[in-house]
Amino acid sequence: MVATRLTRLPEYLFADLEKKIAEKTAAGRDVINLGIGDPDLPPPDSFTKSLQLHAADSDAHFYSSSRGDAGVRKAIAKYFKGRFGVELDPDSQICVVLGGKEGLSSLGRAFVNPGDSVAAPSPAYPVYAQGVATLCDGKVQTMPLTKENGFLPDLNLAEGAKMLFVNYPNNPTGAIATEFFWQSLQDFADTHPETVVCHDHAYSEMTFGDYVAPSFLQYTKNAVEMHSLSKVFNATGFRIGFCVGRADYIAALVKAKSQIDSGAPLMIQRAMADGLAGYRGTEPPKEVVEIRKIYGERRAYTEKALRELGLDVIESPATFYVWARVGDDELPFVQRALDHDIVVTPGRGFGQEGVGYIRLALTQPLDRIKLAMQRLG
């Protein structure tokens, strides 16, 4: 009865985690969920107040457009110029999306034909391989990310692909890209017109210390880049973000979206624009600074605690994920954690190269993370 492509999809990793959490919770257990990257912190007050304000706009109840509100696109262009030094045409190089997952999936529908190859890292956010390649009846060209290669893909493995996905700062590993990698990716994008290069920049603003994440559009115009407010403003449920880059790529995305949705709700788009307006060049608003501080403290504690437990921890100056090797097979560790009412994500859920690793999402208060480490000890 169902489409054949659905039978090729594994159960979505986080749906399985949510099921286990629900079972534990229903049994009255005190579950500490470090499995899913859904921030425990609330959105900044300024964001929710902006949302309330724009809900009363006289046109808030109308359809938007698949490209996004014109005023919001201008605000995105201003933010991008200040934050990254890249000029964008609001009318042709920006599309508002319903969060990164929808944006990435719609990009696939815009470009991937049955049988086309999609170059995707492994381990990686599952949407590249499943939501794009599989749901578009394409094939996956795997680019392994390993500790030995710095969790950076060999771009030779992307030869012949219709689309290529990269993501830095990286989920699940927390890795950041080197200058040499960015230049190599620029060369690939500029010399492979048959391949649509997409940089998923969902964690651009979740960085710590002196590290500042660049945009790939600082290197080339021959790409698109996906941005999300889910993490930086603790707004996963609002489903809002934007895709920017090469005009013909954006036009194809808009055309695909025109058959899928009618744009994000206007009040959410405008709250996003107000949030981005808080940036002063590369300097983030104070709310983002505070969010970074909280996650940075959680990361520093967790990395140290896991090392003391004997795990091989991949240290990182970005994202709210900790990636750690636990052995040749991570499933016994995952089950032991679950026996102690702690949910961690098995690395194999992000691809074959994730076997032997676990990912912890630092989306619990520090005292709960400390309790989890005590239980594991």
What are these regions, as identified by a protein language model?
Residues 35-38, 53-73:
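A glycine-/small-polar-enriched, mobile loop at the entrance of the PLP active site in fold-type I
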Residues 2, 7-12, 17-31, 38-54, ...:
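PLP-dependent class I/II
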